[in-house]
């Protein structure tokens, strides 16, 4: 079990660090992860 949250482009959500540090969520789904895998540096689009 556990609670999951969808974190992404809304500036009112706070930072990813703040979200993780609440201790409320077992899983944090990161929205708009547009570059990943194949040795690439992960990149998120927060525009």
From Swiss-Prot:
PROSITE patterns: GH18_2
Catalytic activity: Random endo-hydrolysis of N-acetyl-beta-D-glucosaminide (1->4)-beta-linkages in chitin and chitodextrins; Hydrolysis of (1->4)-beta-linkages between N-acetylmuramic acid and N-acetyl-D-glucosamine residues in a peptidoglycan and between N-acetyl-D-glucosamine residues in chitodextrins
Key words, A-Z: Carbohydrate metabolism, Chitin degradation, Glycosidase, Hydrolase, Multifunctional enzyme, Polysaccharide degradation, Secreted
One GO CC term, this protein: extracellular region
EC identifiers of the protein: 3.2.1.14, 3.2.1.17
Subcellular location: Secreted, Extracellular space
Role, per record: Bifunctional enzyme with lysozyme/chitinase activity.
UniProt family annotation: Belongs to the glycosyl hydrolase 18 family. Chitinase class II subfamily.
Protein's recorded name: Bifunctional chitinase/lysozyme
Lineage: Eukaryota, Viridiplantae, Streptophyta, Embryophyta, Tracheophyta
